Amino acid sequence: MQGRAIWAEGPIHSFDLPSSSLERGGQALKSGASKTHAYMDEEVGTSTAEAWTWIVPSLSFIQGFMAGQAVLLMLFLGLFRYFFMTSSPGTRAQQQADLLQRVHAVRTSMDMRSHVPPYARVPYEQGVQACVQDLLSQVRYDPSEHAPESLDWLNVLVAQLLMSYRMSILNAGMCAGRNEDMDEPALPSTANAEKTAAKLALERVLNEAMQGRATKHFLDRLVVTDIDMGCRYPTFSHARVRPALHAKSTLVEIDFEYMDALTLGIDTRMWLHFPQWRFGSLAANLCMRVERFAGTLVLEIGTLPEPTPVQARVCLHPNFVLDAHLSTILGSKSKLQDVPKIEELFLARLRSWLEHNVVWPHFWHIPLPGIGTSPADPLA
């Protein structure tokens, strides 16, 4: 039979195959390989189609969900627009009627929820005097029968305020002392850390204030030689309410007394610029001590007869007491000490300043925060 090999013990004999048989065998191999590739391509295509069948439904679900949410939102907006909003404001009468209806509904709801008894007061249109009388009646204060009150609580608050100011001056002086060289002789103002700090703070304030004045060319640098901020506190008592003179408000009168040893000593030089610049200088050392300051303080809150912002006005009765002393030394070579006329002129000038600024009928005006005033208003 052709195409078979016969194995024997002897030598191997081969038979030659015809060429047509070889060609048919090669074509069979090629057709098998092509079928194998086609089968593999069919398997790959099937897996890809299955993957897309999983992706496409997920995208369709998200799109449908978003479309549903958009429809619900548009439906909600349409219902809200139809029930709660209007396209045109309507006539003025209709607007006022709607406003009254809303206000009445809110007021009725508030009255039903709250249990506060109704209060009544005198309308402001009846005048300030009627309002003041109504004010006194509501706070149950009769000026003609009410006894003067003690102000122990106010004494505590003022004492705490004064203590805070003293401590702030001490802290400011300590901060300034870190940057300044204390190469000065031992002065009463440097006896302890508290006085040293107060000296530095006060010197800085006084010398900065002198820079913008015309006297800076005639006065040398100011040196604080002695300072004592005191250790006691003022006391207030016998507060009573009185009607104001212009009958537009009430005022409060408070007696006060402050007994301490407030001391301030300053050393400087006064320059003479004639006939030439800095022709000569006159050394001057002044020390003032306030031992007692007492009187009656008047506090009034309200508006003046003319239209002005709301403010507090403070003044002193003319019978105030100011016990102070001044010691002076003038000159470098020959010295003039404690000239009585200088002390008299200085204390008279101090009392005159008080009388023209804080003694009745002059007031110290303290602007209070206003309503409806612009921020640029200096009194606001």
UniProtKB/Swiss-Prot annotation:
One of its GO terms (biological process) is mitochondrial genome maintenance. Residues 86-380 are cytoplasmic. The keyword Endoplasmic reticulum applies. Residues 147-369 form the SMP-LTD domain. It is found in: Endoplasmic reticulum membrane. GO terms for molecular function: lipid binding. The chain crosses the membrane at residues 65-85. GO terms for cellular component: endoplasmic reticulum membrane; ERMES complex. Coiled coil: none annotated. It holds the Pfam family MMM1. It is a single-pass type I membrane protein. Residues 1-64 are lumenal. Its main location: endoplasmic reticulum. Keywords: Endoplasmic reticulum, Lipid transport, Lipid-binding, Membrane, Transmembrane, Transmembrane helix, Transport. Component of the ERMES/MDM complex, which serves as a molecular tether to connect the endoplasmic reticulum (ER) and mitochondria. Components of this complex are involved in the control of mitochondrial shape and protein biogenesis, and function in nonvesicular lipid trafficking between the ER and mitochondria. The MDM12-MMM1 subcomplex functions in the major beta-barrel assembly pathway that is responsible for biogenesis of all outer membrane beta-barrel proteins, and acts in a late step after the SAM complex. The SMP-LTD domain is a barrel-like domain that can bind various types of glycerophospholipids in its interior and mediate their transfer between two adjacent bilayers. Homodimer. Component of the ER-mitochondria encounter structure (ERMES) or MDM complex, composed of MMM1, MDM10, MDM12 and MDM34. A MMM1 homodimer associates with one molecule of MDM12 on each side in a pairwise head-to-tail manner, and the SMP-LTD domains of MMM1 and MDM12 generate a continuous hydrophobic tunnel for phospholipid trafficking. Belongs to the MMM1 family. This is Maintenance of mitochondrial morphology protein 1. It comes from Malassezia globosa (strain ATCC MYA-4612 / CBS 7966).
